[in-house]
Amino acid sequence: MKLNRREFLAASSAALLARPVAAEPQRLQRKDCFFGLHFDLHPTEQDKDLGRDLTDAMVAHLLQSVRPDFVQYDSKGHPGYLGFPSKTGMSAPGIVQDSLAIWRRVTAAHGVALYNHFSGVLDGLAVTRHPEWARMGPDGKPDQRETSLYSAYERALMIPELEEAARNYDLDGSWVDGDCWAVTPDYCEAAQRKFQAETGIATLPRSPADKGWNEFLDMQREQFRQYVARYVDALHRAKPGYQITSNWFYSTFAPERPTLPLDYLSGDLADLAAARQARIEARYLSRCGKPWDLMSWGFERGTQYSNQSAKPAVELEQEAAIVIAQGGAYQIYNVPTRAGWIDDRVVRTASTVAAFCRKRQRWSHRSQSIPEAGVFFSGRTLYRTAKRPFGGWGGAEAPAAGAVDLLLSMGYSVDLIPDWQAAESIAQYPLVVVPDWQAIGPEAAETLAGYAASGGKLLLCGAENALLLSGALNLRLSGPAQQHTYFVADDTGFAQVAGSWIGLGVPPAQVIASAYLTPDTRKNAVPIAARIPHGKGIVVVCSGPLASAYGNGDTPILRSLARLLLQPLHAPAVTFEGDYPELEPELKPELEPELEVVLRKKDGQTLVHLINTAGVPVTGQFRHQGVVARTGPLRLRVRLPHAPASVTLEPQGTVLSGAYKAGEWRGVLPDLHIHAILRIAGAE
């Protein structure tokens, strides 16, 4: 019988996978994985050489050099073509050699788990061949890439494709891409019928101004949850032990309590200015109670550059340090050639970063937080005020990003407190900061007021939050919230803060900070912060967008304001003393803005992670220069309840000398390049 090309490739792949081999090393479950690699190609109809240059030796060299716990390799990208020979879906026409078969064979021989990268909601080929599967726009036109969650696409094509790959290649799991972040409102007939049945509203809303807009987005979110539940359950049934996730679900992109049986959580950071995104995403994922990792792109693009460039290893190490310090796993994404080749330069960089991470794995992976400063994260605000079902949220997330950056720049160890978790976890934190969210809701307001009444220290930012809690706090306000631009001052100058402000009608004795209508401190002072006793605790109310202002454009003047508000509430547990003897005291630079402190614990020991973020791009307009300046010796103090038995610098294993006095261990860190851990024994 003569075989056609697809049947020949499928038969060849089966033969490759069926070769008798020695007993394979056991592969780690995802919960035990710490470092991984990701490769995707998004095959298209224009590919002619898929798999041509891929060899067992190349894959083996990569695995032996980098020693990842898992690899994620492409099987379907957003165009919709499969990268392997398939009897279920449409394979890319240019498959010369079955890459997935080679990756499975070699990873299995090395005890490395293999996951496939698989595009879910986004499938351009599916909607081209089946227009009835396409998501419908408000203009009545079918989408060119996005499938409809109300269509037969998932059952008829997506799940069978996933099951075929899982079985034929004995995959350990899937990383489903193009999912929650790709979902936009669907105006198909099925959505219209469902919406009318649930709300009684006959016309689907087009904008937030239309009746039923929030209900419409909530319906889309629920439809997505049902879609994810179906493919997760199907794969768990088809291949028991299969581990699967939906990219970015249950992160800040979908900030809700995890209820679906995803086996792990994961997301790929933006290629530009990724460290800043890593700070907030790592802190959010660490709260969700599931194994998690974050992925750095190993390269960066941008029209402003007119070219693509690999990231230097030190930039990836800074991004990795931010992730692993929160207890998570880490992976790096690179793109092979269309023919499957991975150059040794990519291998060397990945190997360097992997070695950096492995040295820190013992005291990083699956550690637990020591609560210090908690930033309240309002998923409700994002779901109620954004114009899409899920993130990325862009500037709408500035309140949280700004608060995290601001607190880190002042030396605090910072966690996020998701609103769905606040009632059960907020009491652990000696300091809680509520950014200037617009719609935290009455349930959150009650939780926050109760936290302060029980003795908590709370910084409440934003006009809307001040108004919402004014009754509970017995806070007098003067007038409604209005748009203003005020000038905030410290000893060095002024910073403008524009946005929604509300007047404070408190007694002068409660005012702790003022702003000005012009850059002139002689007149027109406007109270912008007040200290309010509440029960056993203290609430500092800042009546404007302090967190968002810092998130949109950090400045040391806003740090000065924040110190004025926060230091009396709770001082950081770790403080640094600059060692610049040639400078006058008033000219000595701040150390905190470039040093991140993360307090963790593991195996009964206190862990102080120190991350040097010098040189990290904070905007996509600039690239990392590949140099991270060392700090030199750092005098530091760590507040501890008892004198420690030992303080060891990891990963060097160097025991540090120091003294314990007045509740603080004081010592000298010889030097800090990118990341180090003070492992403190016997101080709990």
Model-identified regions with their sequence ranges:
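Aromatic-lined carbohydrate-binding/catalytic grooves of carbohydrate-active enzymes
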Residues: V66-S99, L122-K141, P185-D186, A190, ...
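N-terminal export signals
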Residues: E7-E24
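Aromatic- and glycine-enriched glycan-recognition loops and surfaces
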Residues: D47-V66, K87-H110, Q226, E397-A398, ...
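N-terminal secretory signal peptides
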Residues: M1-L3
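N-terminal structural segment of carbohydrate-active enzymes
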Residues: P25-G80
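Active-site neighborhood of glycoside hydrolase catalytic domains
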Residues: E154-T252
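Carbohydrate-binding surfaces of carbohydrate-active enzymes
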Residues: K31, L114, N168, W213-E684
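Active-site-adjacent "subsite" loops/lids of carbohydrate-active enzymes
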Residues: N116-Y169, R206-N214
